A protein has these predicted regions:
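Short segments within alpha-helical structural elements
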Residues: 57-113
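Sec/SRP-type N-terminal targeting helices
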Residues: 1-56, 73, 95, 101
Length: 116
């Protein structure tokens, strides 16, 4: 009788430990997903700014610089500096876009695992 009671108590303890581990893993997963969603939102905000402001400014800068250079109002080094600045803006957009896409892929991995 006594060994059986000990085995039951041991099983209950194991069950409680397993449930505790399950809750811990669920919390960690939810926190990870939440963090990915926050990062995606931050990146989306950056992309919106870059699309609506910085990329338009880069386009205007390119047009202005090309026009000024063709009219010989600026030197070649000024032309290069302006083009470099415009290209830096475009490169920044592409880097943020890449980071956004990578974050979406990371988040989707968590959702696709639940279907396996």
């Amino acid at each position: 009788f006594f060994p059986r009671k000990a085995a039951v108590e041991e099983a209950k303890l194991q069950e409680a430990m397993a449930m505790n581990e399950l809750h811990h893993q669920q919390y960690a997963l939810n926190k990870t997903i939440h963090n990915h969603r926050l990062k995606i939102q931050q990146l989306q905000n950056q992309l919106n700014y870059l699309r609506n402001n910085a990329l338009k400014s880069a386009g205007i800068l390119i047009n202005t610089i090309q026009s000024q250079y063709e009219k010989e109002n600026i030197e070649y080094y000024e032309y290069l500096e302006g083009m470099s600045t415009a290209n830096d803006i475009k490169l920044k957009y592409l880097k943020v876009l890449n980071e956004y896409n990578q974050e979406i892929i990371r988040l989707n991995r968590y959702y696709s695992r639940s279907w396996d």
